[in-house]
């Protein structure tokens, strides 16, 4: 997904040949030896020099790698960010800076479907930089601002990825676009709640500091600090939701877009106790003393600060409590500070009268995750699984489920006319993971926000890109609407179809209309189908594909009633069972499985008998 005219592809930007190339492309920061005033901006920290970039419709200005915090290294590891001190002279902001230290996906080396999400700059703990794209020349009147927060399970991600290129939205829609790096994994979310040395949620605090920077400085770029929209996908969307729920963040933005993620998802937060368990286990794994009641938190964190960054990353995944997918080791913690209560409680009691929110999902939210640990799944075959593999997959996909709850999931998702059909079992496994982690939390959030006064719009994205390299059985996977929202199909070198280019332009208009007015519809367009608000009564949402908008009702309503209403009650009930009753139910479960096995064997025997009679 890297256009050949992309002038910031590699860190080696100092070569004379590259500067010559940039000059030929019209991308240099200077013209005939003079500074281009459009590329010089003064912010509170000092002066910046940006770069002019080409986009298919004309040039844009980009200011890349702007420091907004002091490097969180040494004694600042695990600590809240500190604002960047002023600098002297003109700071070069013509190239992306380091990516925050993180896990790198090596499951399919060289495969574009995984490599596109891997870091494309040097890994470093010195990584708190942000980027600004504006139309060229800069807007003369205040322009709405879009702030992107990347996803990656809170363990990975970078604002410099090619799929997050802000030039298209800036050039085509005339907006100001901002993205930032924030700390992930151990460095952003390791927590010993109550301690000063590692309070937790510092990755979210990185994001908040970037939002504060935007409020203080974006007017210098032509942006309107009074019209700021947050948008993010997956963990980025969950982050957006947490800023909605965190009072100190609420004054820093005005609208929010949550793509395929929510703060109330089962993977998005952990309790203070679980966060401490994971932190102390990581410490033990890397040879540091325990903290808490059995030790000293200060000693534990002091020791962890001496460990190489890669050593911490290498041990991150070993702290999860059970085998699972769509669960991540270090995530936001309910700390009583950034999150004063659980997301569910804050959503239920919040006042959202002044909020406009756009939320949605893609068609096949679960498929991407199956190749990362569910038995029988691979990108290199059709992943036609057996019933035994499906049953094992349910335990991995819903790791918190009791035996009875897992049986309920199996019951709900089995096609009882064809209970052994491999293709159905594959698709059912994808639906289990997607519904549980994304679709039904999104539906729940949309309903609760709408009930409490927010203006909500909802969608399902259904188009599979013609350039997608993942296998057909994956459908429209998690994350693959992003390239259309950012307008990548407008670049002819990327080989999208004409229809996809038109589709991308339509989506860009919906998102920027929402950023301007809180409504994705164009007030000047009376002919196109209207996108209605989502209400608790009508539950209307739209399908986004190559066809005109289609309005539907009830986003997987029956299935989400199972996840959002029935299953929590079942889990609560089974939590109160005494041990004898638990054992009885476990025996009953084994007996049921035995009877199913006996019936299958009997049916097989009966068929053989009939065949022998012929």
UniProtKB/Swiss-Prot annotation:
It is found in: Synapse; Secreted; Cell membrane. Disulfide bonds join 100-127, 288-303, 440-560. Keywords: Cell membrane, Disulfide bond, Glycoprotein, GPI-anchor, Hydrolase, Lipoprotein, Membrane, Neurotransmitter degradation, Secreted, Serine esterase, Signal, Synapse. Has been found in central nervous system and muscle. Found in embryonic liver and spleen but not in adult liver. The keyword Transcription does not apply. GO terms for molecular function: acetylcholine binding; acetylcholinesterase activity; cholinesterase activity; collagen binding; hydrolase activity; identical protein binding; laminin binding; protein homodimerization activity. Its EC number is 3.1.1.7. The active site is at 234 (acyl-ester intermediate), 365 (charge relay system), 478 (charge relay system). GO terms for cellular component: axon; basement membrane; cell surface; dendrite; endoplasmic reticulum lumen; extracellular region; extracellular space; Golgi apparatus. Glycans are attached at residues 296, 381, 495. PROSITE patterns: CARBOXYLESTERASE_B_1, CARBOXYLESTERASE_B_2. It comes from the Eukaryota. Belongs to the type-B carboxylesterase/lipase family. Terminates signal transduction at the neuromuscular junction by rapid hydrolysis of the acetylcholine released into the synaptic cleft. This is Acetylcholinesterase. It comes from Rattus norvegicus.
